Amino acid sequence: MAWAQHDLNMPIIQTKYTADPAPYVHGDTVYLYTTHDEDDAEGFKMRDWLLYTSTDMVNWQDHGAVASLRDFKWYKGDNGAWAECVVERNGKWYMYCPIHGHGIGVLVADSPDGPFVDPLGKPLVWQKEHWYDIDPTVFIDDDGQAYMYWGNPNLYCIKLNEDMISTSGDIMQMPHIQDYQEGPWFYKRKGHYYMAFASTCCPEGIGYAMSDSPTGPWTYKGHIMNHTPRTRGNHPGIIDFKGRSYCFGLNYDILRLETSRHAERRSVSAAEMTYRPDGTIVELPYFQDCTLRQVGTFDPFRRVEAETMAWGYGLKTTRENPSGPWNDTPFVTDIDDGEYILVKGVDFKKGAHEFTASCSAQLYGGRIEVRLDSVNGALAGVVNVPNTKFQYQKFTCSLTGAKGVHDLYLVFRGGERQKHNLFNFDWWQMQ
């Protein structure tokens, strides 16, 4: 299904249901960790944590699942991979993972995309008298002291030691912040401490409080995004990136393209946000009514993973290879006639002359139309993908008219004998 409303600020991920955004800036890249609502979820059905990256805030590469419940050997269930938080310290990456009803665990990796391992073999924090230990947010202050906040409906805090996998002192329960429900996001900016959060359910907005101290007292300041019937839940993640500020959250806008019936199949969205001179935040409208401008342009003269896109509704990404072991990286699958990948702001410079795609097909295959600026825009080239017996092969076509900066549409076409599941698509490159 090739449906899109590109003048709306739709969710930034469309190939999976994602929630609980935990963005982290490292160098010139945003690492966006999310939870994962399964495609058949009615209630919360969550088994792993996903990673997406972007250097321009609109084109996102899917890295697949980088951690799952299976990484916690002490947990025997198959559901409960709730809202995570990831931070980097001393060259290590720490993922704090609530496992619903079993506290908050921690995983460690040498790279932001894993592999993540459990250094403790037990929860880092678990208050067994209740089920409030969810939604951790971790921040390292300028003096090196790390703090972890979490909780629904109460807000808790504890200090972390420099090793980031042990705690210091007792758990502190914070006085209730007006409109606080869950999903805290703790950060510091220009001397002010901020506590953003999902505000009282339901529907949840995004509220925030400020403090002069990392442990409060917290003063409620209002909404970053007000409660609205256009969504049900929310969960903030806030960053500064390349001179701009962004608020991530979640909604059900992709689900609503398919059904009006409610289910817990959520989607991460993002919007630019601004601060007043006193540090307070200018309230945002609902995500669809916000803007998300591209920062810079996209380079096509390199290997580009096919699962890098600004829009790809109807497509799916997976690592599961029907002809053998799992791929090291995801690829695009479930490709039907008329669907497409949109990559925004592609800089062809003085001209791209050749397009190469790595694909595999089992039956009749199909073709990729390389179009500029719209799904029916100028046709720059066509790659034909025949039956490859599920083996990946490279296919190349010449290009005409691809110069300067354009939105790139890779439009998938089938023939009379095949309209669905045309082929798998691994990567592409221009020359």
Question: Which positions does each model-derived feature cover?
Answer:
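Carbohydrate-active catalytic/glycan-binding domains of CAZyme proteins
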Residues: 3-431
